[in-house]
Amino acid sequence: MAPTSATDALATADLPIRRCLELAYEALQAGGLACGSVLLDASGGVVAEGRNHAYDPPTGSQPLEGTPLAHAELNALARVATDRDLAGDTLWSSQEPCSMCTAAAAFVGVGAIAYLAPDPWALATSQSRAQEDAFAGAAGTPSVSGPVGEPWRTIANALFILSIAATRGPDHSTVARSRDLDPAALETALALLAGPRPWPPTLGGLLEPVWDVLLKAARG
C-alpha cells in the first residue's frame, strides 16, 4: 500500500533520496539554495553529506561558505579523507551536478553519480549542455544515472524552485521558465510559498499540507 502522507513516504524512501531532500530542506531553512548531496559506499552506508552553502552568510563553520564554490556536492566531497578510495562510492545529489561538481567527482575518483532531478537553474538560464557532454565517456569519469521516479523528482525541484522564489522573488528567471520546463514542481513550489512561515521544522511537515496536490501534479 502506498504511503498516504508525506511523512510516511519520506520514512520509507531509499536512504540517499531521503537524505538529499532533507539536506536540501536544511539549505532552504537557512535561506539558501535547496540542494543536498550524500556520498554512499558500496554497501549503501553514508560516507559524507553536504548541502549548498553558496548563499549562506559566512560564519566560519564551512570553508567555502558564502562562495560560488559551496555547492552541495563539493561540501560532501570536502568531508572525505584524501587517502580514501572512492571508486566504489556513489555521489547522490538532489539535482544533476553541474560541470564543476562532475569534474570534482571525477578528479577525486568517485565511481558513480546519481541524481534525483534535472537542474532547474541550468535549464532556466539556457546553460549549454556541451560542458557536461564533454565529460561523457572520458576516462575516469563517473557513471551517471538519473533522474529518479516520482514523487521524488518533483519534490527535489519544488524545493529548489521554492528556495529561489522565497529569496529572489517569484519572477526570477528560474521560477518563470519552470512554467514550461517543470510545471509540476512549480505548482508545488508556489503552493508551499503561500504557506505559513517560519518553515516547519521537518520536511514532512512542510510537504504534508500540499501532499495531495503534489502527487496529482507529479502524475501530470
Please place each PLM-identified region on the residue numbering.
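Zinc-dependent deaminase
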Residues: 2-27, 108-220
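Immediate flanking context of iron-sulfur cluster ligation sites
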Residues: 85-95
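Local cysteine-cluster metal-coordination motifs and their immediate loop/turn environment
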Residues: 93-111
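A short, polar/charged loop-to-alpha-helix boundary motif
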Residues: 53-72
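Short, ordered coil/turn segments that flank beta-strands lining enzyme active or ligand-binding pockets
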Residues: 30, 42-43
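Glycine/small-residue-rich phosphate/adenosyl-binding loop
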Residues: 48, 71-83
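Short beta-strand scaffold segments in enzyme catalytic cores
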Residues: 35-41
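Short beta->alpha transition motifs characteristic of CBS
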Residues: 45-55
